[in-house]
Amino acid sequence: MKKFLAFALLFIVACGGAIEEASVEDTVATDLEITSTTSAIETTSTTIDDSKDITGLTVLYAGHSFGRPFAENLTKTAKLAGIKDHEQRIVFRGGENGAPQAMWEDPTAKNEIKNALNDGNVDIVILICCSKELVESNGQSDKAIVEIIEYALSKNPNTKFGLSMPWADYPENYIDASEHRLQIDAGYPRYQQFAKSLTNLFPDVDVFTFYHGAVIYELRDLFEKGMLQDVDNLIGPERNSIFTDKKGHAGLLAKDTGSLIWLNAIYGINPMDIPKIEKYKLDIREVAAEVLRKYS
């Protein structure tokens, strides 16, 4: 019963993103200034030298606005790591409408996802937590995800699939970072188990999870400890706040840091092996590397 409640709460708080205009895009985003410095700190991933030989991938993100900024950032972030020719496709719906089940049950969104897959060039499909069925089944089943996988594989049998975990919305509802992260942290292992069940259903298919939402909690914790010089507000202007609104949409620092988690998930790049992001006083690579150590 406790596990079900944790997963149900995960659904309630993780379907982030206010209801926004739907869109299909092939896009890139923010400029990241860099220096050539690197670090010897290691995580289990590819190094910057190795990345020069990595072919850019075509990635489809289908989901809401607690994942969209990172998808938008991927082309720029991949270039930082020496990866050229990354292609990003996005099918977007706001809030709960961006969960896999909601998108797949919406005929228009479903057709947009299919159209993005139809040329057979998509290497990785990224979806975001959580479908209603996944919650109601206590993390046991999600027909929409299964059908999306089946459709993608029918167009490209080598497609891989990533299930991303965002952060809890409405950050002011939580007294601090520790409370903010509690419910999603509790539900994430069940999400990982669900991904493992998909690999049993599709034995030759790579289905993986990643938890970019954990970056938000790390940044909030640093802010609350007075250790985040780049941020003046919990909620405020995008350039100097963790969140841009009460809903909890990410500010620039959170977007850029979370993008390093996406880079690792998709390309296996160690955050500490890309050039330092010089626009911030904080070394956001260290924050991303810490998240990967905790949740990989």
Predicted regions and their residues:
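Bacterial lipoprotein signal-peptidase II cleavage site
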Residues: 15-23
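Immediate post-signal peptide segment of exported/extracytoplasmic ligand-binding proteins
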Residues: 51-56
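Conserved SGNH/GDSL esterase-like catalytic core that processes O-acyl groups on lipids
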Residues: 57-62, 66-148
